[in-house]
Amino acid sequence: MSEEKPKEGVKTENDHINLKVAGQDGSVVQFKIKRHTPLSKLMKAYCERQGLSMRQIRFRFDGQPINETDTPAQLEMEDEDTIDVFQQQTGGTASRASVPTPSHFPDICY
């Protein structure tokens, strides 16, 4: 009987996956989630913990966007894999006026 209990424990452990969510600021939040649970659950929990809105950020795994309906199993995620979080950019590009040029700073070597 004692041999069966570890097997059950292994089975339960295999049903879950540990994932890391890495923010642009270098912070890492760890989550344990079932392999067939939609990642929207993890995404919402991350936003609540960090005080962010789902509309402000985007989640990516291996460079690809994650949909709320995706599961770790569908994306072939493995234990300890990392999901990257990016602020959603709104608006255009940086203004050239904000980039220093030699004429504005003659003492700086370029």
UniProtKB/Swiss-Prot annotation:
Transmembrane segments: none
Pfam family, one: Rad60-SLD
Region (Disordered): 89-110
One cellular component term from this protein's GO annotations in UniProt: nucleus
Localization annotation: Cytoplasm; Nucleus; Nucleus, PML body
Placement of covalent cross-link Glycyl lysine isopeptide (Lys-Gly) (interchain with G-Cter in SUMO2): 5, 7, 11
Propiece span(s): 93-110
Biological processes per GO annotation: positive regulation of ubiquitin-dependent protein catabolic process; protein localization to nucleus; protein sumoylation; regulation of protein localization to nucleus
Major localisation: cytoplasm
GO molecular function: protein tag activity; SUMO transferase activity; ubiquitin-like protein ligase binding
Keywords: Cytoplasm, Isopeptide bond, Nucleus, Ubl conjugation, Ubl conjugation pathway
Ubiquitin-like domain location: 15-92
UniProt key word Ubl conjugation: yes
Cross-link (Glycyl lysine isopeptide (Gly-Lys) (interchain with K-? in acceptor proteins)): 92
SUPFAM superfamilies: Ubiquitin-like
InterPro entries listed in its UniProt record: Rad60/SUMO-like_dom, Ubiquitin-like_dom, Ubiquitin-like_domsf
Entry keyword annotation includes Cytoplasm: yes
Complexes and interactors: Interacts with SAE2 and UBE2I. Covalently attached to a number of proteins. Interacts with USP25 (via ts SIM domain); the interaction sumoylates USP25 and inhibits its ubiquitin hydrolyzing activity. Interacts with BMAL1.
Function (record text): Ubiquitin-like protein which can be covalently attached to target lysines either as a monomer or as a lysine-linked polymer. Does not seem to be involved in protein degradation and may function as an antagonist of ubiquitin in the degradation process. Plays a role in a number of cellular processes such as nuclear transport, DNA replication and repair, mitosis and signal transduction. Covalent attachment to its substrates requires prior activation by the E1 complex SAE1-SAE2 and linkage to the E2 enzyme UBE2I, and can be promoted by an E3 ligase such as PIAS1-4, RANBP2 or CBX4.
Cited PANTHER family: SMALL UBIQUITIN-RELATED MODIFIER
Protein name (database record): Small ubiquitin-related modifier 3
